[in-house]
Amino acid sequence: MIDRSEAVAPAASQDAVAPGSVPASSRLDRVIWALTGLTRRHWLLGLLLAAGLVLRLLAQVGYEPALLYIDSMKYLFGTHLGTQFNQSDLGSYDPIGYSLLVLHPVLIFENLSFVAVLQHLGGLAMTVALYALMVRRGLTRWLAALAVAPVLLDSYQLNAEQTIMPDVLFEVLLVAGIVLLLWPPRPALALVILGGLAFGASAPVRQVGEALIVPGLIYVVAAARGWRTRLLHGAVMTFCFALPIVGYMTYSAVTLHYGFELSNMGDAYLYGRTAHAADCATLKIPAIERPLCPDPAVAATLGVDGTVNSIDSPRSTYHPVDVQAGQLINTMPLQVQLAYSVLRQQPMRVVGDIARDSVKIFALTRNGEEGDTPISRWPFQTSYPYYPYYRSATAHYGRNSASRVFAATGGGGKARVFRPAAILLRDYQLHGGYTPGPVYLAGLLAGIAGIFTWRRRRDSGLALASVLITGSAFAVLLGADLYEFTWRYQLPALVTLPIAGAFGATAVARYIRARRSGVPAAVPAGHAHADGVEELAVAVSEQAS
């Protein structure tokens, strides 16, 4: 006969645990409960993330291995001297930090589709980071979720993530700098260093990132306490911001032989903006410069981009000859002289031209105006898009065909489209799948209002956050509009203006509440936790151990 107590003893010994330890089943239960609680608390973000993920999967399977834009070639081949595509000179037009930071490392895996996947993950990561920042700083969960919805659902953002272009990397660096600097109410020196490096690294990706030093420096100085800390943080921010820029310029001079610069297109776009704005009939300039000043009808048709890049622009068709030397005259110095003449004699025309471009982002619909870079370049197409009329772009056939580009850069197969997914994405984009301009305007106005809630002797965390985010939006959007307006350059609005609006609206609401009650109503910034995130982290770490 078997003793029942002896029969159950082995089972009991198997379930025994060391004193002070937690059973594995209990740890797993804690993880499950933490995940369940997290989902319940952040259900709106979860729904938006699910929708954003579906849209990104459609884009990934709809256009393989990735989309190519007119300027994609210079990033793919800008540092490959002597390629069969003969585009090595294009790397000097714009900084190619995107090639160095993303394309070259990822193409080790010999498939451009991995670049698109990485950029889609970047879009999702920006959403989660911004949402976590807002919840941490005490904003309501529903407001934080609505503020990040444009990043997840905007079809132009989806198109950018699927395209071999630097826009998404620029957004990621911009968001990284904002999140690092705002994570605590007053950033420690380590976060100032990291935030400055993130902002500075954005400039070799898109040169307009140079403007981020202004809001970044203002914020770290204003957020610090004591003049010594302000001086230290300001100096460190400036140094760390400059480090990636100087490093890239050195690389450009020593390795690429383009010169100690980020780009060589500054003078060209200065000419384009001023020539487009000029009243040539009343402008007092030398006769040799006169042909470079376009007629009003020509300027309106070409726009700023066409004035710089079109083969029909005055800078392309005008070829003055030095009779004595018997050679053509380089017109670039003449273009610069014309630009400065316009700035001196007609500054308000230039200001007005920039102002008209800067408000286009607030339009209800996505309609291009005469002279604007065609918005038709950025909607999803039902077949693979080609740009055969541009020297540096891809064509359907020939040596610059998209399929040959993919083969030359490491693989991914031929350019192909899954039409059902492409049709769905195009219909979504053309029927309201984008962020309307009034949303941006509301975010901007709320962000500005939040700045004016700053109070010296009370909690000013949200007001200072509004300074950084709204200032960053001003820097990158207006900085781009100084040279030209294109809808592609408005993408950073998605990761700044709605967020600025959420911070600003919360700051205003708390300010009004405090004025009515006579007591500060602010939640101590940085003490609000992410509603279950910490509990989940603890549970996961215990499960792993």
Which stretches of residues belong to each language-model region?
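Membrane-interface transmembrane helices that cradle and orient dolichyl/undecaprenyl
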Residues: 177-192, 220-224
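Transmembrane signal-anchor helices characteristic of membrane glycosylation enzymes that use polyprenol
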Residues: 40-67, 153, 241-252
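Transmembrane-helix signature of polytopic, membrane-embedded enzymes
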Residues: 130-153, 171-172, 186-193, 467
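Transmembrane alpha-helices of multi-pass, membrane-embedded glycan-processing enzymes
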Residues: 98, 102-109, 115-129, 170-173, ...
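Multi-pass, polyprenyl lipid-linked donor-dependent membrane glycosyltransferases
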Residues: 70, 93, 115-122, 149-181, ...
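Juxtamembrane membrane-water interface segments immediately following transmembrane helices
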Residues: 67-69, 74, 234-334, 341, ...
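Extracytoplasmic catalytic/substrate-binding loops of multi-pass membrane glycan-assembly enzymes
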Residues: 62-76, 88-101, 109-110, 261-262
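Membrane-interface anchor segments at the N-terminal boundary of transmembrane helices
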Residues: 40-43, 113-114, 353-469
